[in-house]
A protein has these predicted regions:
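Rossmann-like NAD(P)(H) cofactor-binding subdomain of soluble oxidoreductases
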Residues: 63-64, 68-128
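Oxidoreductase cofactor-interface core, primarily capturing Rossmann-like NAD(P)-dependent enzymes
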Residues: 6, 10, 15-18, 108-137
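Short amphipathic alpha-helix with an adjacent loop that forms part of the alpha/beta core around
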Residues: 53-56, 77-79, 131
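NAD(P)+-binding Rossmann beta1-loop-alpha1 motif at the extreme N-terminus of oxidoreductases
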Residues: 1-39, 43
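A short helix-to-beta-strand connector/capping loop
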Residues: 44-48, 113-116
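Short loop/edge segments at beta-strand edges and connector loops
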Residues: 30, 50-52, 119-122
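Short acidic low-complexity segments
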Residues: 45-60
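Short, hinge-like loop/turn segments at secondary-structure boundaries
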Residues: 43-47, 81, 103, 134-137
Length: 137
């Protein structure tokens, strides 16, 4: 099983720390080039590796930790998300009109055609994730 975190802000970095604490390999990517993320990734742990977005989405499980409005750009990196699991850690604040009363995860799930889709981690502040002792990732 391979893992990637797309988005390397507070939540993305907190999740990377959680993987590193458990000595689990995880790829991280963002709109910045991998080289720009490398110092932060190395500081988190040896199991945290930076890659381009295109390479990161080759993982089996992708944690989406980007602002709500950026989910479509991530979804466009693959023509089909068949066989992938996408964990949506986004929050839609302020609530975009495009939701039309739907949960943000319902809107995001439509962009990731064929993926198994899970909503998670969005209810926790980054500090809670940083200190959490996750039983499983």
């Amino acid at each position: 099983m391979s893992y990637a975190i797309v988005g390397f802000g507070e939540i993305g970095q907190a999740l990377a720390h959680a993987f590193a604490r458990k000595n689990i390999d995880v790829t991280v990517a963002s709109r910045q080039p991998p080289e720009a993320l490398a110092p932060q990734a190395r500081a988190i742990g040896l199991t945290v590796v930076t890659k381009s977005l295109q390479n990161a989405v080759e993982a089996d499980t992708i944690i989406l930790a980007v602002p709500f409005g950026e989910h479509r750009e991530v979804a466009k990196t693959l023509p089909s998300w068949e066989g992938k699991t996408v964990i949506d850690a986004t929050n839609a604040f302020p609530v975009p009109e495009e939701l039309d009363g739907l949960p943000s995860s319902a809107v995001i799930a439509k962009a990731f055609t064929g993926a198994k889709f899970v909503k998670g981690f969005n209810h926790l502040p980054a500090a809670a994730v940083m200190g959490a002792k996750l039983m499983a990732v």
